[in-house]
């Protein structure tokens, strides 16, 4: 039997990387199982592990000596390491925008430090943490370098700042400047801290 539907270029969908992730979550983080209401469902656990893997890479490469993962009763997860921290300087991306290293690493799905030949075994070859970020309602990132704290938050992979701490449903102001990071003096040792607040879900 011959199909009646026409087949032309309009039949082919071109999705953005973010849209593709939303439609193919199970390919990245596996299928959901168990109690979907549990704060640490299988997909969320896999997503958080991608961020942990990046921290483990830093320690495995000799750039740090500590990784700490904290699971809070309210459902939030915090990942900390004593490595170098994501680069906070700015450079041009493939679209001609000036972007921070933090945005490159966590906001652009196709980017990663493992593509230059110096990668290590853990993670989804440099794209896992960015995929986690794009599928999270909220992700707070702090990088400690040179006596300063560089901070930014993300909502579905978009950089900006929330009106209140810890609430994934708080008002969100999107950053038009992808190179911007909030900087304050902080003498804590170098490293990185990523926080998934309570209620963070894999969409």
Spell out what each predicted region is.
Residues 33, 71, 79-81:
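Compositionally biased, low-complexity repeat tracts
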Residues 39-67, 128-135:
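Conserved ATP-binding N-box helix of the HATPase_c
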Residues 2-11, 75-101, 112-203:
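GHKL-type ATPase core
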Residues 25, 29-33, 55-59, 109-116:
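Structural motif corresponding to the C-terminal cap of alpha-helices
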Residues 66-74:
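Short beta-strand/loop element within the Bergerat-fold HATPase_c
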Residues 1-49, 92, 100-107:
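Bergerat-fold GHKL ATPase/HATPase_c domain
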């Amino acid at each position: 039997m011959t199909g009646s539907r026409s087949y032309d270029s309009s039949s082919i969908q071109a999705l953005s990387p973010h849209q593709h992730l939303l439609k193919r979550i199970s390919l990245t983080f596996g299928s959901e199982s168990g109690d979907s209401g549990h704060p640490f469902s299988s997909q969320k656990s896999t997503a958080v592990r991608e961020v942990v893997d990046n921290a483990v890479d830093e320690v495995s490469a000799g750039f740090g000596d500590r990784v700490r993962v904290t699971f809070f009763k309210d459902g939030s997860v915090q990942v900390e390491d004593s490595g170098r921290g994501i680069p906070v300087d700015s450079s041009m991306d493939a679209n001609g925008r000036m972007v921070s290293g933090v945005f490159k690493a966590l906001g652009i799905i196709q980017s990663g430090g493992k593509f230059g030949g110096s990668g290590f075994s853990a993670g989804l070859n440099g794209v896992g943490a960015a995929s986690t970020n794009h599928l999270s309602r909220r992700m707070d990132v702090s990088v400690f370098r040179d006596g300063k704290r560089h901070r930014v938050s993300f909502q579905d992979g978009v950089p900006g700042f929330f009106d209140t701490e810890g609430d994934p449903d708080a008002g969100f102001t999107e950053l038009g400047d992808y190179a911007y990071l909030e900087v304050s003096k902080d003498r804590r040792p170098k490293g990185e801290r990523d926080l998934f607040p309570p209620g963070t879900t894999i969409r």
